[in-house]
Amino acid sequence: MSKDINIVSRGTKQVGQRLLPWIFPIVLLVVWQIASSSGLLENRILPAPTAVVSAFWHLLISGELWQHVKVSAGRALLGLFIGGGLGLLLGLLNGSSRFASTLLDTTLQMIRNIPALALIPLVILWFGIDETAKLFLVAVGVFFPIYINTYHGIHSVDPQLIEMGKSYGLSRWQLYKEIILPGAMPSILVGLRFALGLVWVLLIVAETISAQAGIGYMTMNAREFLQTDVVLVGILLYALLGKLADVLAQLLERYLLRWHAGYQK
């Protein structure tokens, strides 16, 4: 009997833990709906949640929404692949080589202090207003979180483990595969999660550069016609896509770090 009670108690606790993060958003939506229905909020300023859902549904069934999401997701993934890939490679290089770090790290840190958004006028002069400009902004923005975390992840590996690996006769590649990369992986994945959140922020601005498709274009176009409900749909889409990217990064983190004590149940 007591065993059954414990099972039910654990199940109730797990359900409660899953529902807890959604309590505040649900309460916020209810208050928002009440304020809109009672006239405290003008629809021109902040439409009711039901109006936003209606706008979302119309965009969905028309196929327009999927087109914009597909374009934005493609830009985000390609920018992340380019910027993140370069950040990972240079982070591994500078983290492993004192000569490369001395040669390159100071320059990269100086560039890091330049806000990516401040580069917009120069990017337009360089690349015009086509896709290259948008991808460049996203790639530059996501480069540094992955570079810095990879660089510091390599440096945080216990030197005694590396020496032990050398004493066992491991080659340089084996040291990387068995000791250095696994030791740096937690830090690298933190950089990836940060970059996945940042990519959508950068994309919002990048898609205002004379885009013809994408969530940013949809939002800016709706602003021109005072369609506040569509603007909110675009904002919420960025939030949902960012959350989805973070969840996928967490799943990847659990898979790659399944050997780590902190990720074992």
Predicted regions and their residues:
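Periplasmic/extracellular loop-to-transmembrane helix junction in inner-membrane transport proteins
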Residues: 7-14, 38-81
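Generic hydrophobic transmembrane alpha-helix motif, especially the helices
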Residues: 109-145, 152-153
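Transmembrane alpha-helices
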Residues: 136, 140, 173-205, 229, ...
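Transmembrane-helix boundary motif in ABC transporter permease subunits
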Residues: 78-108
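Glycine-rich helix-loop "coupling/hinge" segments at transmembrane-helix boundaries
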Residues: 124-125, 154, 201-238, 257, ...
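Transmembrane alpha-helical segments of polytopic membrane transport and secretion proteins
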Residues: 1-24, 247-265
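C-terminal transmembrane helix and the adjacent membrane-cytosol boundary/short C-terminal tail
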Residues: 98, 186-190, 232-265
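Short helix-to-coil transition segments within interhelical loops
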Residues: 154-160, 164-184, 224
